[in-house]
Amino acid sequence: HLELTRDIANRFNGIYGDVFTIPEAYIGKSTAKIMSLQDPTRKMSKSDENPNASILLMDDPDTIIRKFKRAVTDSDMEIRYSDDKPGIQNLINIYSCITGKTIEEVEKEFDGKGYGEFKLAVGECVANRLKPLQDRFYELQKDKTYLNSVIKENDEKAAYFANKTLRKVQKKVGLTERIR
């Protein structure tokens, strides 16, 4: 969707002048791509047919840990970051990102330990990181009055900015006389 938005904005701006701000994607360096837990050569996707391939933000801790325990890895047992070990490489990237440890620190921490212990640690780490977000989500879900007030407030803000942009677009394309 971002690329389509960028294309439309660039095309419109090219014809009518600068009207739209071109959106830029934010991609963190360490998590530019989190790979599938079941096929580490493919990007993790919530729409993957295999429910064990991805971690959803609202997965409960047991589900998260179970998915990491089932993550595809090679038959070697050495926890080492290497392109020929995409499954372990993916898990190391995830653990490194969540803990803030370097890849070398992760390798050292799990030196001499097996994949089972490492997968459990990654699962627990991710589950613990998601817990505050999940707790806040469930807390907000209980307060329907607050949620409705936020929706109303932001609906009004969105309408204001959308109308402002629409008037700008109408003026640029010469529709100001016909549309009020």
Predicted regions and their residues:
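Conserved nucleotide- and phosphate/pyrophosphate-binding catalytic cores
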Residues: 2-180
